Design a protein with these regions (language model features):
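Flexible "cap/lid" loop of the alpha/beta hydrolase fold
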Residues: 107, 111-112, 117-151
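Active-site loop/oxyanion-hole signature of alpha/beta-hydrolase fold enzymes
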Residues: 57-97
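Short beta-strand immediately N-terminal to the catalytic nucleophile in serine-hydrolase-like folds
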Residues: 96-99, 123
Length: 191
């Protein structure tokens, strides 16, 4: 992948990688939350958005080129990161665009401090019914299994192999080619 963020925010739990382009009203782009997610997901749209805005594209803690500390990652951790990033790096009321699972903690960040978030745009957010489910015995057992050092590391290595990420990038390219014109135009019109 040819995406190399060039700026870092020294956050309390590690260095957070991000890019900054353009001038104008600030927009923060937040990627989905999967093992292979990063700000690279936005690389095709940042230039267009940067024509009239200051565009910040972040690699969340544990993703992309940001630090990956051996900690328990929670939604509240990301809520704190988003709030701190907007306050300490952007320093102005910001439009936040989020995809997938990251949408839920962007909403929580806004609820936590609505004075720093101007608008929220969610792309393919998680179903609210899934997000509000309480863990049961089976899900707790699966979580323990995934968090075990041997099996968890094994799964992480499988999901982050270069050929797996390249395969996903190719799938994304096919999907993007099909929908990108409509998607880009709608995002640019909103902003």
């Amino acid at each position: 992948l040819d995406y190399i963020p060039d700026l870092y925010y020294d956050w309390k739990l590690g260095e957070i990688s991000y890019t900054k382009q353009g001038k104008g009203k600030p927009i923060l782009l937040i990627h989905d939350l999967t093992t292979y997610s990063s700000g690279y997901e936005w690389h095709k749209i940042t230039e267009k958005l940067a024509e009239n805005n200051t565009v910040y594209c972040i690699d969340l803690l544990g993703c992309g080129n940001s630090d990956k500390p051996n900690i328990l990652y929670t939604n509240f951790l990301y809520v704190q990161l988003i709030n701190d990033f907007i306050k300490n790096v952007i320093g102005d009321k910001t439009t936040v665009v989020a995809t997938g699972e990251s949408s839920s903690f962007v909403l929580a960040a806004c609820s936590n401090n609505s004075e720093i978030i101007d608008n929220i745009i969610m792309i393919n957010p998680m179903d609210i019914n899934i997000l509000t489910k309480s863990p049961n015995k089976i899900s707790e057992l699966i979580t323990k299994f995934i968090n075990s050092p041997v099996f968890g590391t094994f799964l992480y290595n499988i999901f982050t192999r270069k050929n797996k990420v390249k395969s996903l990038e190719n799938q994304d390219q096919q999907h993007i080619r099909h929908h990108k014109r409509k998607f880009y135009i709608s995002i640019v019109k909103i902003l």
